[in-house]
């Protein structure tokens, strides 16, 4: 996914943004691939490495609470983080546990975005097996870490546009 905008102008806009990446670290190898793609995407678009903070949650279920905590942090009345990217993997097993975890994680992440009006994107892979997971963590289906990060970057632009539009 390539967002069409002036990359030179975008570097100025993004260079001062502070981003939190939350990694539900249950599947370490998979999550490492998601995290690396996310970090590379952020730096490619001008976000400085020292403005990217990575937080590790034990699993996907814990991501929304950590996202809410990070979204609520402020300095001098302004949000500490301009955007949050949630990454992880949940693989279907033999019980309904998969549905509960996936639904609550997705709902919780979206609620953070709505409540705090901070772009908070969902890069948690939810698949039926490890083969599908690998395919979406840098394999032939792309990398959900990169995709979620691009969605967050695009939302940063759109939120700024929405704030500055005059009708």
From Swiss-Prot:
It is an enzyme of class 2 (transferase). It holds the Pfam family DMRL_synthase. Its EC number is 2.5.1.78. The keyword Calcium does not apply. Pathway: Cofactor biosynthesis; riboflavin biosynthesis; riboflavin from 2-hydroxy-3-oxobutyl phosphate and 5-amino-6-(D-ribitylamino)uracil: step 1/2. Signal peptide: none annotated. One of its GO terms (biological process) is riboflavin biosynthetic process. One of its GO terms (molecular function) is 6,7-dimethyl-8-ribityllumazine synthase activity. It comes from the Bacteria. (2S)-2-hydroxy-3-oxobutyl phosphate binds at residues 94-95, 136. Keywords: Riboflavin biosynthesis, Transferase. Forms an icosahedral capsid composed of 60 subunits, arranged as a dodecamer of pentamers. Belongs to the DMRL synthase family. Catalyzes the formation of 6,7-dimethyl-8-ribityllumazine by condensation of 5-amino-6-(D-ribitylamino)uracil with 3,4-dihydroxy-2-butanone 4-phosphate. This is the penultimate step in the biosynthesis of riboflavin. HAMAP family: Lumazine_synth. This is 6,7-dimethyl-8-ribityllumazine synthase. It comes from Vesicomyosocius okutanii subsp. Calyptogena okutanii (strain HA).
């Amino acid at each position: 996914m390539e967002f069409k905008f002036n990359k030179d102008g975008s570097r100025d806009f993004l260079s001062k943004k502070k981003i939190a990446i939350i990694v539900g670290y249950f599947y370490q190898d998979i999550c490492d691939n998601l995290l690396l793609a996310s970090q590379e995407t952020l730096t490619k678009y001008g976000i400085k490495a020292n403005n990217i903070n990575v937080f590790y949650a034990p699993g996907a279920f814990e991501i929304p609470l950590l996202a809410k905590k990070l979204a609520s942090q402020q300095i001098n009345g302004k949000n500490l983080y301009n955007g949050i990217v949630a990454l992880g993997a949940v693989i279907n097993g033999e019980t309904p546990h998969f549905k509960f975890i996936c639904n609550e994680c997705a709902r919780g992440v979206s609620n953070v975005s709505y409540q705090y009006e901070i772009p908070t994107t969902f890069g948690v892979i939810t698949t039926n097996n490890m083969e599908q997971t690998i395919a979406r963590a840098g394999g032939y289906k792309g990398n959900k870490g990169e995709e979620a990060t691009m969605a967050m970057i695009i939302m940063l632009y759109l939120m700024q546009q929405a704030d500055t539009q005059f009708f």
